[in-house]
Swiss-Prot record:
Homodimer. Its cofactor is FAD. Signal peptide: none annotated. GO terms for molecular function: oxidoreductase activity. Keywords: FAD, Flavoprotein, NAD, NADP, Oxidoreductase, Redox-active center, Stress response. It comes from the Bacteria. Induction: By oxidative stress and catechol, and very weakly by heat shock. It comes from Acinetobacter calcoaceticus. This is Alkyl hydroperoxide reductase subunit F. Serves to protect the cell against DNA damage by alkyl hydroperoxides. It can use either NADH or NADPH as electron donor for direct reduction of redox dyes or of alkyl hydroperoxides when combined with the AhpC protein. Belongs to the class-II pyridine nucleotide-disulfide oxidoreductase family.
Amino acid sequence: MLDQNIXTQLXAYLER
């Protein structure tokens, strides 16, 4: 369940 949260934050971090 935390995997989905990390994915979202990862995407935003890489999209910066």
